[in-house]
Regions:
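Short, well-ordered coil/turn residues at beta-beta hairpins
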Residues: 167, 183-184, 407
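Extreme N-terminal leader/targeting segments of oxidoreductases
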Residues: 1-52, 131, 145-146
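Conserved beta-strand-loop-beta-strand element in the redox core of flavoprotein oxidoreductases
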Residues: 155-174
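Flavin (FAD/FMN)-binding glycine-rich loop and adjacent Rossmann-like elements that form
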Residues: 172, 179, 188-433, 437-455
Length: 619
């Protein structure tokens, strides 16, 4: 039930061929007070108090700080680096993952749209982006900025943060506030404050499973015209090019042989800089703990050593690269995933792929659920492509701390939902929401938890967001599958990452299932959803004969299911096995018939997998 790795790579490349041009519908003008009318914020000195403190100068943090400042409150933005922009300006990710609606209207507006317009589109010059972020912040006199300031720890009183300790120029300093926003990549403030969280795919029972990290590298002396001609003449498969970017190139990446299996060159995302040089996002590094500075430093060294060989390979492989020169690499790695905080609501894959609109929606997204490779044994999977889904305010509100919001990729998303929700434009939209909510909560003197529970307060926050330029349309997208008899089973296997629907959302409900696919589906479901890896291990030898790529009959499906329930199913004839499994509610024979030689389809397999886990949970 999983696409072959090669197909996944090609489909990912083809998808990106279709979304190059910026395509926005009518955008409402922002209703904003003159920033000069705001009382200035005090300078970032030790012991200073603010209304709102934002930790993290990532794009999401800039959005949060600017959004709060637009509401007239006094804000401090704390950033450990010497500038703003984080992943965009220090990880050199200069190729934006855009989110469009059904009519190609831009979904992520507000501060992101401001940034997008000022940098000139979805591919930008890193130096320009860094300046744009700085200019955004400096526009507001009530927004103070403290660079080169590393968060150290929160000051807690019960379930509230009253201040933070930070280090600047070797000296410890303290800032106080009534509201805090964690916009760090790894939710470091939330974690230090005691907010519970999972790491990587821990919420699926696989804590060591994390998406590959990437080192973006910098090449010069590129003949862009020669590359453009080759792409447009079709001499390079699955590639697309404009005056600012080129992408695809799946065959090129696949042809490179790295010096170690911990590295892989995937399809190339190439973004031009204003000086004609290029940045390439393609080099994947496996086995990296994004929460360990030692692990990241080792990964950086490993990747940097590989870059001369990659450059030489591209010189030989790509038109226009014959004289390519390696100019360096990003100062930081592109880490796609570390923590996922536990929030009042955990956005999951079904919410994303079935286009859920929440009553407390504060941002919209549509980016495909693109989970990058987690090991050298896979190339990553596109679990599906939503039309439009929403992020609920509750997913920004962490459990256990009353006056903190978390924005960006480490907010309240499951591992799989984050495959879409992690992208920066969505993160900046959540930053806008956090800034507005922080200011509003001060006005009404309510905690974020209280706001989340009050529909009237949420409506006020949504209205303020729209006035500030956000886009929160309820598309009321109907799901044609919700009346299907196997829909609960489909949602179950989808929630646990047991099927891969691809860019076309092919759920394979009517497709025949083979024995091996059903074995792995049920085994992984028991491990991930029921926490019964012990049961899977205990039955592995007995079920080994099912590891065959041949059609799955209903009789064999029944035997496998009954084996997990502790029965000697091998002794049953196929018809008796089907009858017994049906009696236990494992097989929907009223929908599919009871022929033991009938071939099981996806719908029946999903139904059976969900029912198996439900029964095992009662053993």
């Amino acid at each position: 039930m999983v696409w072959p790795a090669r197909m996944a790579m090609l489909e990912r490349a083809r998808y990106h061929l279709t979304i190059w041009q910026a395509r926005s519908g009518q955008v409402l003008a922002r209703q904003e007070r003159d920033p000069s009318s705001f009382p200035p914020a005090p300078p970032a000195l030790d012991g200073t108090r603010y209304d709102v403190v934002v930790v993290g100068g990532q794009p999401e943090g800039v959005a949060a700080a600017v959004s709060a400042a637009r509401q007239g409150v006094k804000v401090l933005l704390v950033e450990k680096r010497d500038g703003l922009g984080g992943l965009f300006t220090y990880g050199w990710l200069n190729f934006i993952d855009m989110n469009y609606g059904p009519k190609q209207e831009l979904l992520t507006r507000g501060t992101f749209l401001d940034f997008y317009r000022q940098v000139g589109g979805s591919v930008f010059d890193v130096a320009v982006a860094k300046k744009v972020f700085r200019d955004m912040v400096e526009r507001y006199p009530n927004l103070a900025l403290s660079l080169n300031t590393a968060f150290k720890e929160p000051i807690m009183e019960g379930g509230r943060i009253t201040g933070i300790k930070a280090v600047r120029e070797g000296q410890e300093i303290t800032f106080y506030a009534d509201r805090f926003i964690d916009a760090t990549q790894d939710a470091v403030v939330a974690a230090a404050a005691g907010v519970p969280y999972t790491v990587g795919a821990e919420d699926m029972g696989e804590p060591e499973r994390r998406q590959a990290v990437t080192l973006v590298f910098h090449l010069g002396n590129i003949d862009w015209g020669a590359l453009e001609q080759a792409v447009k003449e079709g001499r390079i498969k699955d590639a697309k090019i404009s005056d600012r970017a080129a992408w695809g190139f799946a065959d090129v990446g696949a042809a490179y042989q790295p010096s170690t299996p911990r590295l892989r060159l995937r399809g190339l995302n190439i973004g031009r800089q204003n000086d004609g040089t290029i940045l390439i996002n393609a080099l994947q590094i496996f086995g990296v703990d994004g929460l360990s500075e030692v692990s990241k430093a080792e990964a950086m060294e490993l990747a940097q050593k590989e870059l001369p060989a990659i450059t030489a390979f591209l010189r030989e492989r790509l038109p226009g690269f014959g004289g390519a020169k390696l100019l360096g690499a990003a100062p930081e790695l592109y880490v796609r995933e570390t923590r996922h905080i536990k929030a009042l609501y955990q956005l999951d894959l079904n919410d994303v792929l079935f286009n859920r609109y929440f009553p407390d929606a504060i941002a919209l997204g549509s980016y495909p659920v693109d989970v990058q490779a987690t090991s050298p044994q896979d190339t990553g999977y596109v679990y599906g492509r939503p039309e439009v889904y929403s992020i609920p305010f509750r997913s920004l509100v962490p459990q256990g701390v009353d006056n903190l919001l978390v924005v960006g990729r480490s907010a309240g998303y499951t591992h799989l939902a984050a495959g879409s929700a992690r992208v920066v434009p969505i993160g900046m939209a959540t930053g806008d929401a956090a800034g507005v909510a922080a200011a509003y909560s001060l006005k009404v003197n309510k905690t974020f938890r209280d706001l989340a529970a009050d529909r009237a307060d949420i409506k006020e926050i949504q209205d303020l967001l729209v006035k500030a330029g956000a886009y929160l349309k309820d598309y009321q997208i109907k799901n044609p599958l919700e009346n299907h008899w196997a829909f609960n089973g489909l949602k179950f296997v989808n929630r646990w990452g047991l099927i891969v629907a691809g860019y076309n959302n092919d759920w394979k409900l009517d497709a025949p299932v083979n024995q091996a696919s059903f074995y792995y589906m049920t085994a992984n479901a028991l491990k991930r959803a029921a926490g019964r890896g012990d049961l899977v291990a205990a039955k592995a030898a007995v079920l080994k004969p099912y590891l065959q790529r041949e059609p799955l009959t209903r009789g064999n499906a029944a035997r496998l299911l009954l084996t997990y329930l502790g029965e000697d199913a091998a002794a049953l004839d196929p018809a008796a096995a089907v009858a017994r499994a049906a009696a236990k509610g494992l097989l929907p024979v009223d929908k599919t018939g009871s022929d033991p030689q009938g071939i099981v389809t996806g719908a029946e397999a999903y139904y059976a997998t969900e029912r198996l886990c439900a029964l095992v949970g009662k053993i």
